[in-house]
Amino acid sequence: ETVLPDKFPCRQGWIPARAQVSEAILLAEGQKSAVTEYYLNNGEWPKDNASAGVASSAADIKGKYVESVTVAKGVVTAEMKPSGVNKEIQGKKLSLWAKRENGSVKWFCGQPVTRTDDDTVADAKDGKEIDTKHLPSTCRDTSMTN
């Protein structure tokens, strides 16, 4: 039996949360090279967007589903918009962060973290983290991941 396109169980115009989250990851990843370059040149993580050399206002880095992208001590955190996105991810966040590794840096992606010192990050869960089920398998690192 042939299933016609109009028989699919999804509403017209409905976009899955994971597809919307991918925009947040792309926008956050867009800041990685600036953060890496700053770290390699200065030996410390950039404290904010301006020192990283990216848009000074976090709200200037935004998309259709993303409210803002913030750099804080080298941790790049993307926050979803409070409306116009899947209800399960409204206002929720994810982070990208790097750790030193053999003179270079290795990047991680997952639920929000905060940098406690040069080599350590801690979970920054406050009820505003994007549920792991909405994160792609490539973005499920934790603060403990090496």
Residue ranges and their predicted role:
Residues 1-38:
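Amphipathic alpha-helical segments typified by the pilin-like N-terminal helix
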Residues 40-146:
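Periplasmic/extracellular, small/polar-rich flexible segments of pilin-like filament-forming proteins
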